[in-house]
Design a protein with these regions (language model features):
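Residue-level signature of mid-helix packing/kink "hotspots" within the transmembrane helices
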Residues: 3-11, 110-111
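Helix-to-loop junctions at the C-terminal end of transmembrane segments
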Residues: 8-22, 121
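C-terminal ends and interior cores of transmembrane alpha-helices
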Residues: 31-57
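Multi-pass alpha-helical transporter architecture, strongest
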Residues: 43, 131-167
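Hydrophobic core of transmembrane alpha-helices in multi-pass small-molecule transporters
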Residues: 51-77
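A membrane-interface helix-boundary motif in multi-pass transporters
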Residues: 54-59, 119-137
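Intracellular juxtamembrane helix-capping segments at the cytosolic ends
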Residues: 77-90
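Loop-to-transmembrane helix entry/capping segments in MFS-fold secondary transporters
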Residues: 92-102
Length: 167
C-alpha cells in the first residue's frame, strides 16, 4: 500500500511542482511528512476522538493505516520533488557528479537517521523517537528559506554555457 501511495504522491506533487515551483512544493512535502508522523504518534487519541465525535467504531489499526497512506504520499512526493530540484540546479555538464553527491548524502542521512531514531528509542521509547523525526523534517525546512529557485536555475544555465564555450 505504501508503494502505491508513494507513486501517487510522486505523480501528484510532480504536477504541483510545475505550478508552484520546486522550493514551495518541497516545503509542502516536508509538511506532509510532519502531518504523517503526527498522525502516527497520535493514532490512539485520534481513534478515540473520531469514534466519539462521529459515532464510529474504528480500531487504532484502521487509523494507523490512514497514517501509513500519508507516509506513502510523503515518501513518493519528497523523493521525486527533491530529485527534480537537484536536476533543476545541476548544470548539465555536472549532473552525474551532483546526483552522485545527492545519492551519497541521502544514504548518509538514512544511516544517521536510523541511528538517531534507534538511540532515541532506547533512551525515550518509540514515541520519543517518532517525535525526533518531526524535528528532522522541521529542520529541513530551514535551508529552503534561503533558496532562490530562479537564481539557482540561472546559475546552472550559465555554468552549462560556460562549459560549452570551454570556460
Amino acid at each position: 500500500v505504501v508503494q502505491i501511495t508513494a507513486l501517487l504522491g510522486a505523480v501528484l506533487f510532480g504536477a504541483l511542482q510545475g505550478r508552484l515551483g520546486g522550493r514551495l512544493t518541497y516545503a509542502l512535502t516536508l509538511l506532509l511528512w510532519i502531518a504523517a508522523i503526527l498522525a502516527i504518534y497520535f493514532v490512539e487519541p485520534m481513534t478515540a476522538s473520531l469514534n466519539a465525535r462521529l459515532g464510529l467504531a474504528l480500531h487504532a489499526e484502521q487509523v494507523f493505516l490512514f497514517a501509513g497512506l500519508l507516509s506513502g504520499l510523503s515518501l513518493g512526493s519528497s523523493q521525486s520533488v527533491g530529485r527534480a530540484l537537484v536536476g533543476m540546479f545541476a548544470p548539465e555538464s555536472r549532473a552525474a557528479e551532483l546526483f552522485g553527491f545527492w545519492g551519497l548524502f541521502s544514504k548518509l542521512a538514512a544511516i544517521f537517521g536510523i541511528f538517531g531514531v534507534g538511540l532515541l528509542q532506547w533512551l525515550f521509547g518509540l514515541q520519543g523517537a517518532v517525535l525526533f523525526c518531526i524535528l528532522l523534517f522541521a529542520l529541513a525546512l530551514l535551508p529552503l528559506l534561503a533558496i532562490d529557485e530562479a537564481r539557482g536555475v540561472a546559475t546552472a544555465r550559465r555554468a552549462d554555457e560556460g562549459a560549452r564555450a570551454g570556460v
